[in-house]
Amino acid sequence: MSQPLPPGWTEHKAPSGIPYYWNAELKKSTYQRPSFIEKNHSSSVTASQASLAFNTSEKLFVNENAEERKNSRDLRKQLPDRPKFKKRIPNNDSWVVVFTKKNRYFFHNLKSHESYWEPPLEISKDLKILRLPIRKQISKDSSQSQNVDSGKTNHEEIHESRHLQTEIEEPSGLEESSEESVLYSEEFYEKSDEEEDEEKSHSAEELEFGEEDIMYQLQQLDDETVSYDIQEQATNLSTDDARRVFTELLKDKNIGAYQPWELVYPKLLDDDRFYVLDSGERRKEVFEEYCKSVVSTKKITRRKNTLSDFWTLLHSLPSTLLWPQFKRKYRKSSTLQIPGYSERDFEKLFREFQILRKQPMQDKLLNFKKLCKSKTVDPKNPDEFTESILNDTRYAVLTREELDSLACSSN
C-alpha cells in the first residue's frame, strides 16, 4: 500500500496514463511521488529545526524538478512517431515525401503503397527542387565506434532501419546492399535547444515505429490521397481556366511582382493548383503576366487616388460648412498636402463640391453622364474611370449608393 501524499499534493493521470502529482499552493507538478519530510513530533519546535525543514523541502523540490525534466525527455523519446505533413514531388504523380514528428522523412508511393528511406532512382532528379533536409552519411567503422559507449552495435542499427522499412513497405522493394554499406542519420537546419540536448546525449539512439504506428501512418496517407483528385481534374480544364486558376494561386499567396520566378515557385509546390498547368514554361509565362498586371495596377491606383482622401473628408462634413471654417480647421491636415494643388485650387474644389452636393440625385447623375461622355468613358464601368474623372467634382459629389444605382440602371 502506497504512503499518503504530503499536505497540498494531489495525484492525477496524464492522457498517456502516467500518474503525476500537483501542488496547487506551489503551482508545481512532478512525475516523482512526493514524500513526507521528517518532522519533530515534540510539542516545541525550534526555529533552527523549522529552517532546516524548509531548506530540505526546497532541495527536495529542486531535485524532483530535475528528475521530472529528465523523465519528460525520456517519455517523449518513447512516444510513437507520427506523420506530420507531406510534400508532393514535382513532375511525379506517384511519389510523395512524408515528414514525421521526429524530424525524419521517407518516400511513399501512392499507387503501390510502398515506402523507402532512400529516394528511388526515378525521382532522384526531381528532389533538388524540394531542398530536403541534409542527411549525414556515417561510415560503418565510425558508427561502430560511436555505439560502443551506448551499448548498441552497428548491426543492431542496421536491423532497426531494416525492420522499420519492412513494416512500412512490401519486402520485395528493398535493396539490402545499400543499407549495409552506409547508415543515415538525419540532421535538420533548425532545431530547438531541447532537441539539440537530446541529440547530444542520445546521438546513437534510433526510435523504432511499432506496428500500430505504421498502420496509422499508412491510413493517414490513404485518407489524404483525396486531395490529389484536384490534379486529375486539372486535365479537364481549358487552357484559359487553368491559367486563371494559377493566377488565383499567385494572388492567394501574395506573391510580389518583383521576385524572380526561381525563388517563387518552390513556395507554391504544396498547393494543388500549381499543377493545373502542365509545364514549367507555361507557369513562368502566367507568372510574368501576373507581375505586369500587378505593377500596372499599382501605377493606376497611385494615379487615380490623388484626391480620394479630400473627397472622403468633404462627404463627412455638413453641406452648410463654409470655406473659411474649413480652412481654419484643416489647413495643416495631410489631406491638403497634395503636390500640384495650391490653396486656391482646394478652395475652388471645395466651393464647387458644396454647391453640387445640394442638387437632386437625378441632376447629379445627369452631370456625371455628360462628364463621362466628354471623356468617352462608360459611366457604368468604374474600371474605366480616368484620373480626370476621379478628380472632378461632378464625380466626387456622388455617393456610393448613387453610383451603384447608375450601374444597375438600364439606360
From Swiss-Prot:
Species of origin: Schizosaccharomyces pombe (strain 972 / ATCC 24843)
Keywords per UniProt: mRNA processing, mRNA splicing, Nucleus, Repeat, Spliceosome
Polar residues bias (residue ranges): 140-151
Entry GO CC: cytosol; nucleus; U2-type prespliceosome; U2-type spliceosomal complex
Skewed-composition ranges (Basic and acidic residues): 66-83, 152-166
Disruption outcome: Cells are defective in DNA replication, S-phase progression, chromatin structure and cytokinesis. Dre4-54 truncated temperature-sensitive mutant has 'Trp-117' changed to a stop codon.
Occurrences of domain FF (ranges): 239-293
Protein's UniProt name: Pre-mRNA-splicing factor dre4
